[in-house]
Amino acid sequence: MTTDWAEIACEVPAEMVDTLADFLVELTGNGVGIDNLHLDTFSLDTLEDTPLKSVKGYLPLDDSLEEMRIRIEQFLAQTGPSFPGYVYAPPVVTVIRNEDWANNWKVHFKPVRIGRRLVIKPTWEEYLKQEGDLVIQIDPGMAFGTGAHPTTKMCLEALERIGFYAHGGKLPSPVLDVGTGSGVLSIAAALLGAEEIVAVDIDPEAVRVTVENLELNGMADRVAPSTTSLEQLPGGFQVVVANILAEELVRLAGELTARVAPGGWLILSGILTEKEAFVCAAFSSLELVENPKELEWSCLSFRKPL
């Protein structure tokens, strides 16, 4: 017997998106869709004047739906007023037939430009390449990032800056991508000139998706993806990038620092601004070079002394 699904869409201020998304993931056990946050426009700069975002959760169309809808309404009513610009609006429920479920999320993923030259496009979208563009083709699957989230975006921009400004236009090798997910950072590193990249993730499914995306981009010979633990990897990486939770960054601080070569770079993301000092304290042996922020997220770029 096939299962149809219900999409529950909630309109909230941009500042509330991550709070609501986390709640929906915990409540439903499924992924979420976010419209007009970073995926419905080619230029991220145009999003500042868009006050409301649509966050969509997904539930089986069964007897539990009404109870879940009420819990979502209660969460909105209780949590929403603490966010500037919030006005309560009841969630909108739409039925998604089983045959459409697997591909429904894809309509929200459009080509997006990040930094000066990087462009991320899904495999099913057409894109007219411009001079100088470095195009990443990606088929992330429902469980992995598209590259447009602020945490990933800031990592991509940091990689581009390090290569362009600090190393004459070419990202130095080797590069270590910790928590690779869909492999987008590793592919970007290769496009930016790195000749040797190691990509690790504790999730075998992430490694499988990364392998597929490497093949899509012709990078399979330059990136080595695996579930190898940090402890098993050698040191000497010129660039280490880790886009994972702040608590995990702190727990792995010693291992991450040890993987960076003298004079090398460590890019950390996945950090809520309120936890920035907590993370910085764990990496106090390194020099903090830059600290960009977007929405409630912070990215830290360190350099290891020679």
From Swiss-Prot:
It comes from the Bacteria. GO terms for biological process: methylation. Keywords: Cytoplasm, Methyltransferase, S-adenosyl-L-methionine, Transferase. It is found in: Cytoplasm. It catalyses: L-lysyl-[protein] + 3 S-adenosyl-L-methionine = N(6),N(6),N(6)-trimethyl-L-lysyl-[protein] + 3 S-adenosyl-L-homocysteine + 3 H(+). Its EC number is 2.1.1.-. GO terms for cellular component: cytoplasm. Pfam families: PrmA. Signal peptide: none annotated. GO terms for molecular function: protein-lysine N-methyltransferase activity. It is an enzyme of class 2 (transferase). The keyword Methyltransferase applies. S-adenosyl-L-methionine binds at T152, G179, D201, N243. Methylates ribosomal protein L11. Belongs to the methyltransferase superfamily. PrmA family. PANTHER family: ELECTRON TRANSFER FLAVOPROTEIN BETA SUBUNIT LYSINE METHYLTRANSFERASE (PTHR43648:SF1). This is Ribosomal protein L11 methyltransferase. It comes from Geobacter sp. (strain M21).
